[in-house]
Amino acid sequence: MHIAFVLMGAFGHVNPTLPIAAEMVKRGIRISYFTTEPFRKKVEATGAAFYPVTSRMASAKADPGADMMAGLPAVFLDEADGMIEEILEVLKKDRPDAVVHDFASMAGTLAAASLKVPDIEIFQSYPSSPVLSNAAPFLTVPDTHPARVKAAALAKKFTEKYHAKYLSVKEIFDGFGDFNVVTMQKRFVPGAETFDSNVVFTGVQIGERDSNIDWKFPENGLPLIYFSLGTVFNSW
């Protein structure tokens, strides 16, 4: 079996997938992993074959800034547009059995659609449900906003060229793949009881870390609360 992973080059998107890729390799599954060059060592350490892709977002230092709600869908779609042909050049010659990606890594959606293989979406955070819509804050922006006009044009192009589902703002943030993996405990997910069998909950995926961290737990006997600001506050 051959599975392709397609993830945008950001720690919060790549890191949760690495233990999954490593476990799949241990089970004899061949993994082709597409992301940006800075993640080469981390990916190769899992046993996956690493394929670097171009990132328009990284090269342009894309930052929607205060207008994030308007601009982020176009940023994600443009990122997919910049790398999809590189990915397909490899996968058309070495066809995968499925493509794994997350909501922001829509080149994976396009690759699965173009190759007509299952689309597996991985959720590193809360998936949308009848009681929680990740798209809701983004839907307050009118379709006439220049960033939304750009996003709509890209979505239309992808549907026509790659036969992908129309990647509307709601589809980007509230959509699901053919099969879905949530790296959270089910009891923490609002509306989890509404999902059917194509959504599985693996719990948090913690793999080996190569970082040298000299921080130690304080020995004062007090309860400890850990806050992670993630990639949002660390330039992706």
Question: PLM ranges: what are they?
Answer:
Residues 2, 26-236:
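Nucleotide-sugar-dependent glycosyltransferase catalytic domains
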Residues 14-27, 39:
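Short amphipathic alpha-helix
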Residues 6-18, 233-236:
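A short, glycine/small-residue-rich beta-strand->loop->alpha-helix junction that serves as a flexible
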